[in-house]
């Protein structure tokens, strides 16, 4: 059995921000969001560079291992371009982006995630979050120092511990059905 998809991508600046630092992609087999880090120079550039570099991984794969390898390879390549851009434009130092994407292979989904852009699985009448935020506050929850309810209003809830900036640490989850 294959997974059938319908997709679209849209983004809205909202009422608070002055610029939109999001990039997204809704393709045939690959769907992702890259959310540029607000408050840092070049969040919009970081998300666009990652999105342009990673979108090329949208193709049919024989298996989920090949899909995961291709996505991670594309992310690492795009991350190198991001680092090169910072080297050539020092004013962009500190720019980064989150990345959360799924690629469909037959009846399986491969998920790659870094940062705090969430992925949810929707089936029948259930919605389940399948990613865990890579934030300072999530780490506090994980270690039992604060409750999930306290995390919702914590003043540092948006402080990322991992992003596409200077890292090759990717949480690549495979075989999600």
State each model region's role.
Residues 1-168, 172:
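PP2C/PPM-type serine/threonine phosphatase catalytic domain
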């Amino acid at each position: 059995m294959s997974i059938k998809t319908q997709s679209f991508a849209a983004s809205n600046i909202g009422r608070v921000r002055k610029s939109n630092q999001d990039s997204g992609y809704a393709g045939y087999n690959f769907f992702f969001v890259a959310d540029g880090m607000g408050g840092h120079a070049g969040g919009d550039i970081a998300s666009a560079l990652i999105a342009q570099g990673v979108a090329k991984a949208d193709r049919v794969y024989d298996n989920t291992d090949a899909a995961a390898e291709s996505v991670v390879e594309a992310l690492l390549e795009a991350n190198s371009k991001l680092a090169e851009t910072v080297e050539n434009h020092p004013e962009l130092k500190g720019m980064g982006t989150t990345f959360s994407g799924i690629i469909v292979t037959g009846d399986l989904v491969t998920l790659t995630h870094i940062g705090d852009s969430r992925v949810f699985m929707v089936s029948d009448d259930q919605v389940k979050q399948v990613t865990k935020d890579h934030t300072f506050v999530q780490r506090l929850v994980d270690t039992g120092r604060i409750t999930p309810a306290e995390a919702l209003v914590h003043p540092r809830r948006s402080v990322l511990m991992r992003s596409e900036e200077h890292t090759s640490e990717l949480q690549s989850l495979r075989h999600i059905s």
